[in-house]
Swiss-Prot record:
UniProt key word S-adenosyl-L-methionine: yes
HAMAP family from the UniProt entry: 16SrRNA_methyltr_H (MF_01007)
Organism: Pseudomonas syringae pv. tomato (strain ATCC BAA-871 / DC3000)
Enzyme class: transferase
Name of the protein described by the UniProt record: Ribosomal RNA small subunit methyltransferase H
Gene from which the chain derives: rsmH
Record's GO cellular component terms: cytoplasm
GO biological process: rRNA base methylation
Highest rank taxon of the organism: Bacteria
Amino acid sequence: MNSGFTHITVLLEEAVEALAVRADGCYLDGTFGRGGHSRLILNHLGPDGRLLGFDKDPQAIATGQALAAEDGRFVIVQRSFAELGSQAQELGLAGKVSGILLDLGVSSPQLDDPERGFSFMNDGPLDMRMDPTRGVSAAEFIASAPAEEIARVFKEYGEERFAKRMANAVVQRREIQPFERTADLAEVLKVANPAWEKGKNPATRAFQGLRIHVNNELGDLEAGLEAAMESLEVGGRLVVISFHSLEDRIVKLFMRKLAKGEADNMPRNLPIQYKAFEPKIKIHGKAQFASDVETKANPRSRSAVMRVAEKLR
């Protein structure tokens, strides 16, 4: 399926290099998207290598199915990467996966297609679901949630300073007419935001908060990180690319905790086995960012942060 919307894979070479792909290894691409990372991983795999892709988006699944038809080493499943642990168990891969890649956030085709309802730049139905067949849409949430809950979503997930004021404006307007279109909501948020940031649409943070809430992105990330560590073999690598501070903070703290060993997180008066002092992972290098060349070619890569960890035990 060709949706007509292109996607430029961020940190393509860097992410696959960080995975240290073995020809006979088994790898998971937790965010298949349009398959940029997956195709390069397959190029590094030999005949006995395997790659399993995950995505919730039906258009991504269609692209993945076409790739699977071309290459028998690849399989795609329509699931969140938060479920990769159970999928690995079903396939007998628990503790046997050589590397896992998570490229977080929303893809360019999702943002650029007005019918998906992610963007305030192009008018479309107010949806925002990665999988439009499941869960509550942004319009349904906005229509029924109390002002306090809407404000919490804007503030907690969008880091919006004027969350309460903007949520009240949304509730007042919905009493007159429900929100069905992205441009309609964006206009109300724009008027309610008293302090516009230079170069940024005043609805940006609120839209981010809504999208994260509708798709349970942070909850999925926390579950996916835990599942990834259980699924990896010793020596296997986890590569995560995040696109905003909330995601990156979760990834950074998760990796730091495991790099210190569990004993660092336990009360000092408990009898603790020596093994608890041993780190579970090794963090490879510092956070990596897109190069100047990449950010000029793809401005959306400016906010990308990549972190890499290797499982030790």
